[in-house]
A protein has these predicted regions:
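Juxtacatalytic substrate-recognition/specificity segment
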Residues: 1-77, 81-91, 97-101, 105-110, ...
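Acidic/polar loop patches that form or flank catalytic/metal-binding clefts of enzymes
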Residues: 25-31, 87, 109-117, 170-175, ...
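Acidic/His/Gly-enriched intrinsically disordered linker/tail segments
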Residues: 38, 95-167, 183-184, 213
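Hydrophobic, well-ordered secondary-structure elements that form the walls
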Residues: 98, 159, 209, 381, ...
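Amphipathic alpha-helical substructures
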Residues: 148-238, 247-250, 268, 281-286
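Beta-strand-rich binding/interaction modules
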Residues: 205-206, 221-384
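Short acidic/polar inter-strand loop motif in beta-rich domains
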Residues: 385-399
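Compositionally biased low-complexity segments at domain edges in trafficked proteins
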Residues: 410-437
Length: 437
C-alpha cells in the first residue's frame, strides 16, 4: 500500500490542522485512517479507498481521490461528530459543511489540487438542470433526487460564495468559527447556522439563505445595454438666454378632507388646541388658512438672467478632469440575486474590477441600472470574470461578444473517469526519466 504509507498519516495531520483552523481545536486524542474499498466515517476512525496497481504505480486520479477521501472522512469528526447535526433530517448540514471544509483543506494541501466541490463554476451544470429535477437544499434528505449536488456540492459552494464574494474571508471565517464554537457537542438546526452567521458577522443574509437554500433559481445576470458619454472640454459657450416666468401666489396648505379625527376633535369640549390656549402662536398663516388675511393674488414675474460658459478648456479639465461615464443596465434572468462583479478592459490594455453588493437589487430584483465613472476609455466589459457566482449563461455577460468553446469542446473538457480511476493511460508506468525534485 505505497499510497497510504506515503500520504495517509500526513493527510490526517493536515486535515486536523486545517479543520481546527477554520472551526475549533480537535478535541479527541486520536484520528485513524484505514485503507478500504470505499470511504466511511466513525468517531476517531475512518475507512478510505485508493489502491495502487500491482506494479506499485498509480494514476493521478487514484492519488487525488485517496487524498480527498481521507480529508473528507477525517473531517467528519468535526461534522457531524462534534458539531452534531441530524444527518437524516438535514444531510447538507453534515455533508455540505464538511465538503466546504474539505475544499479549504484541499486548497491548503496543494494550490494545484483538482478540487471537485467548492468553486462556483463547478456547480453550474447542476444549476442548469430543469426545475423538475431540482429541489431546494432545505428539502428533507429522504426526498432528494440529486443527492450529491444537493447535499454536498451546492451547500459547500454557497458557503464559498459567501466567503469569497459576499462577506469576505475575514468576516466569514470569524462567523463560521463562532458557529462551530457555539454548537460544538450540541445539536444545531439550519436556523442555528443561519442565525449564528448573521449574529456573529452583523450581516443581513436573509436574501442569500432564501435564494440559495430555500429556492432552486439559478444565477443568470445579463449585461443588457451600455451607454457612455465623455466630458466635452472643447465646446464653446453652452449658456442659456434670459428667461421670464410667472409664479402664482401659493394657496394655504390644508388637508383636502377633514377626517374623522379632526371632526371629533372639534366637537370634543375637553380638547383645547394649543393655538387657542396661546393665541401668540397664531401667525400670518394661521389667519391665511382661515381666510382672515388679505393678500394680493396677482402672479409674481420672475426673471432668470442669461448664463454663459466662461470657463476655458484648461479650467474645465481642472474641475472635472477627463472622465468617461458608463451607464450599464443589468437583468436578473435566473432569479437568484448575486453581487455585480464588473471587469473593465480599457483601450490602453489595462483592467479594473468593480464589485457592487447584492443590495443593489433590493428595490427591483429584475433589473437595475448603475453608472460608473472612469478615467479611461473602455474597450470591453465582462461580468463575473473569475466565475464566482455560478452564472449559468456566460454568453450574456459581455459587451463585445467573445467566442465560447463548442459543445464538443466543452464535453471533452468535462470528461473524467469513474471514482478513483484515471481518464487516460497511467503516465507513471511510462516514465522514462527521473523527475526533478
Amino acid at each position: 500500500y505505497p499510497l497510504y504509507l506515503k500520504y495517509s498519516t500526513k493527510v490526517v495531520a493536515h486535515t486536523i490542522k486545517s479543520y481546527s483552523k477554520f472551526t475549533i481545536p480537535y478535541p479527541y486524542p486520536v484520528a485513524q485512517s484505514l485503507e478500504a474499498a470505499n470511504g466511511m466515517e466513525y468517531p476517531m476512525i475512518c475507512f478510505n479507498f485508493g489502491r495502487t496497481e500491482k506494479d506499485g504505480t498509480y494514476s493521478e486520479a487514484t492519488k487525488n481521490g485517496m487524498i480527498g477521501v481521507v480529508i473528507h472522512e477525517v473531517g467528519h469528526n468535526f461534522f457531524p461528530m462534534i458539531i452534531n447535526s441530524d444527518e437524516r433530517q438535514w444531510t447538507w448540514m453534515d455533508e455540505g459543511l464538511n465538503s466546504y471544509c474539505e475544499y479549504l483543506t484541499e486548497e491548503l494541501w496543494d494550490n494545484k489540487f483538482p478540487v471537485s466541490k467548492g468553486p462556483a463554476y463547478k456547480i453550474v451544470d447542476y444549476m442548469k438542470l430543469p426545475k423538475d429535477q431540482l429541489e431546494p437544499i432545505m428539502t428533507n434528505s429522504e426526498n432528494i433526487i440529486q443527492f450529491g449536488p444537493n447535499a454536498y456540492s451546492k451547500p459547500a459552494t454557497g458557503l464559498n460564495i459567501l466567503r469569497e464574494t459576499i462577506m469576505g474571508r475575514e468576516l466569514f471565517d470569524y462567523a463560521f468559527k463562532e458557529y462551530a464554537r457555539r454548537w460544538a457537542f450540541k445539536h444545531p438546526t439550519p436556523a442555528d447556522l443561519f442565525r449564528t452567521m448573521e449574529d456573529a458577522s452583523g450581516e443581513d443574509l436573509d436574501w442569500f439563505w432564501r435564494g440559495w437554500f430555500y429556492n432552486t433559481d439559478p444565477c443568470d445576470i445579463s449585461l443588457d445595454t451600455v451607454r457612455w458619454a465623455a466630458l466635452n472640454t472643447d465646446s464653446e459657450s453652452f449658456g442659456t438666454k434670459e428667461r421670464m416666468f410667472s409664479l402664482p401666489v401659493a394657496k394655504p396648505i390644508l388637508n383636502n378632507f377633514d377626517d374623522v379625527s379632526k371632526q371629533r376633535n372639534r366637537k370634543d369640549k375637553n380638547i383645547v388646541f394649543a393655538t387657542d390656549a396661546d393665541t401668540s402662536l397664531r401667525d400670518f398663516y394661521w389667519h391665511y388658512a382661515r381666510g382672515l388675511a388679505k393678500v394680493d393674488t396677482s402672479a409674481t414675474e420672475i426673471i432668470i438672467p442669461a448664463n454663459t460658459d466662461t470657463l476655458s478648456r484648461e479650467e474645465k479639465q481642472s474641475i472635472a478632469g477627463n472622465k468617461y461615464f458608463y451607464e450599464l443596465t443589468f437583468s436578473n434572468k435566473g432569479g437568484l440575486v448575486m453581487p455585480l462583479i464588473v471587469e473593465w478592459t480599457f483601450k490602453d490594455g489595462t483592467k479594473e474590477i468593480d464589485r457592487v453588493a447584492a443590495q443593489i437589487w433590493r428595490k427591483n430584483e429584475s433589473k437595475v441600472v448603475k453608472t460608473f465613472v472612469k478615467n479611461k476609455e473602455m474597450a470591453s466589459i465582462k461580468l463575473d470574470p473569475m466565475r464566482e457566482t455560478a452564472d449559468i449563461d456566460e454568453k450574456n455577460n459581455t459587451w463585445n461578444v467573445e467566442t465560447e468553446p463548442s459543445k464538443f469542446q466543452l464535453f471533452k473538457n468535462r470528461t473524467r473517469g469513474p471514482r478513483g480511476a484515471s481518464n487516460g493511460a497511467n503516465p507513471m508506468q511510462k516514465e522514462i526519466a527521473t523527475y526533478i525534485k
